[in-house]
Amino acid sequence: MARPFRFGVNLMSAAPADEWRAKCRRAEELGYDVILAPDHLGMPAPFPALVAAAEATERPRLGTFVLNAGFWNPALLAREVATTDALTDGRLELGLGTGYVQAEHETAGLPWGSPGERVDHLRRTVEELERLLESEDHQPQPVQQRVPLLIGANGDRMLRLTAEHADIAAFTGARTRDGGSLEPLAAEELDERVALYRKLAAGRAEPAELNLLVQIVIVTDDPGAAIQPWLPRIPHLTEQQVLELPIVLVGTLDDIVERVRAQRDRFGFSYLTVLEPNMEVFAPVIARLREA
């Protein structure tokens, strides 16, 4: 039996307190299950933003999507996680990744390191967080017995780490290029990544939830025309190839609903995250899927 859908929205733009809370309430009204905050310079600090979101809402879970592990000391992060889980009444979901924007580390005066070094640091962070948050001696204590852990992954070592530790396996649907740019994965490439993850996770007692970050959502009767402004950003792919990317949902409402169902069947993606600019346009998709 397929896992039920969950839907998250990543709120990226800063706003005064009243506007931020109103935006969070709107996400709840639209049916989103998770309100998420990123971890990039120039965007709101994730933990206070999530506490404010909790004060403004009742139902949604609240998560980081995803923390840049290179910004965080594990002991200090454990304190933030436990405090935020307490202040949100146990609604926190912790998302972690290696980070992919070198310029942010340079601006913050933090070491960047090689890809392997960043994965090593993330592994140490995950293991130390688990040790601290599972200890009865750690103060403060989180409300949840285990704060659900999401790890954003694509490379082999990251998928192994995700298989070993994460409650939610988040697929970006893209590979990182030098300089911090992202190159989308075709469906066949994503098949291979998901298959490797499943192989690595074969011994798990409980299967993880699989997440996909959807980058583009456009409801339209003319997908070819609608996708034109995006093509210069993905010059190595044809129009049809872009429209077939798993992270792109462009078409009529019926088309998108069926595409979401088909991708759950094919890849196992039951938890979809959209970006803030797509919050309103994706809401009818949520409503239609909930009707079924």
Where are these regions (language model features)?
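Active-site-adjacent structural elements that line small-molecule/cofactor binding pockets in enzymes
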Residues: 1-292
